[in-house]
């Protein structure tokens, strides 16, 4: 296992630089913020009585986990967030009602930030969704860490790290499920909404930890030299977060950090397939080819036959793309010592994960699937093809600077190789506004846009009742796959998915 070795590579603005005997590749002419490899704490015990500012409490558990962790280690903790106490009520209620916490060491500054909280702190714990550049609060901080950097600095677990644009959450879920079923005492954390600080005290040098990394979480590790995964997986790369990065080269530059400090004792798993037209590296070839040239680890390519390939007869989760995610999980399980046939048997019982084509309800023969984690158009387009027959699609929302062509071409029938939805229901939002002209031009019938889930589901119920009276055939799946962000109507994609499932169950009993 790789453990927490000293960094042997250096990351500097605008390029990924390995040792001189390794490949050199200039990624893009931009400035990336590089963090210090030094930590403000010499040890976990050194946290006691330090002043910690947690930048961002949030509703997904990351800020809450950091507050709990540092309080448990005897620190003085200040939690600050731009959101108000009313907006953060669920998280605050959990913290304030927990009698095991030392509330005399906990302070809240909500509804805005105070520069003094950053200037006076021994360490600031940063939210990954906050850019360093141009942020006066971070610029005033003596030291900046994240929940992931703290976990990686002070543990020596074998890390299985996964990033990518499509399929990373499903892949980590399948890996974690497989490890547990194979008898490993494994843990899962990261971008899948579980902070690794929640299980910090439960791991040791033999505990496999599966971590999903967003590009932002990886960017927050640049220069620290703490991420040395025994196994690194990069799932399919497609345009994402282009409203943040502005171009694919900068976006992928952060993804590439996942393997920057691997060694020849480690494994890298990359795509062998083609990138979508116009989305590959400026230097030519594919992203998978580039990754394979750069990493020092042993390379395994998926989307091609290898010694680790498994032929899945069936999976509980629908879609060919889910078979690819399961294949990556099968490869990881084999690298961890699980026999190939056993890996196949385990993964064929994998139930999938919440908010990813999650079957959750049946009403009058109609099966309902929650795919709220589909925040990019390509994911929603894939969901329409996952069942091998036309679906009733509930989609739309707020766009984030992405091309909508892949989804629009399915909806308006331009993609002749794809199954067009049997019916379309649209949530209001800027992404929906960009889809509508193509649908109108093609004379596609659609419902909406609706300003709320309740309005959309009310119309859907009426239509399904009418269809049930007229149609005795097998009912089409009803799939909620927005292909857009949740912001505006919901706190995040998980809040959106939970509210969708609750609304469906309440309305369709």
Which residues are covered by each model-predicted region?
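Phosphate-binding loop of NTP-binding sites
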Residues: 45, 71, 116-121, 128-268, ...
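N-terminal amphipathic/hydrophobic targeting modules at extreme N-termini
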Residues: 8, 16-22
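Nucleotide phosphate-binding/pyrophosphate-handling subdomain across enzymes
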Residues: 35, 43-51, 69-73, 315-421
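Short internal beta-strands
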Residues: 75-83, 268-272, 394-395, 420-429
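Short beta-strand "acidic-cap" motif of Rossmann-like dinucleotide-binding folds
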Residues: 77-81, 188, 301
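C-terminal helical cap/extension that packs against the catalytic core
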Residues: 91-98, 404-477
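Residue-level signal for inorganic ion chemistry
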Residues: 70, 124, 162, 191, ...
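N-terminal leader/targeting and accessory segments in enzymes
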Residues: 30-146, 427
